[in-house]
From Swiss-Prot:
It comes from Campylobacter concisus (strain 13826). Part of the 50S ribosomal subunit. This is Large ribosomal subunit protein bL31. The lineage of its organism: Bacteria, Pseudomonadati, Campylobacterota, Epsilonproteobacteria, Campylobacterales. PROSITE patterns: RIBOSOMAL_L31 (PS01143). HAMAP family: Ribosomal_bL31_1. The gene is rpmE. Its cofactor is Zn(2+). Binds 1 zinc ion per subunit. Binds the 23S rRNA.
Amino acid sequence: MKKDIHPEYVDCTVTCACGNTFKTKSNKSEIRIDICDKCHPFFTGSEKIVDSAGRVEKFKKKYAQK
């Protein structure tokens, strides 16, 4: 690898919307995510709707029975 052309590789704190945090390595020092393994329905076994931008309401409004 060439010297002085690669971004710095630092410790990173990943923060989920549910409050879970964990450490990893990245080019960024902090990353925020919407869903992680502690709150994802596949891993928890519970079903919940994740709608951060109102997409479900927009879909229902667009395709509502008239």
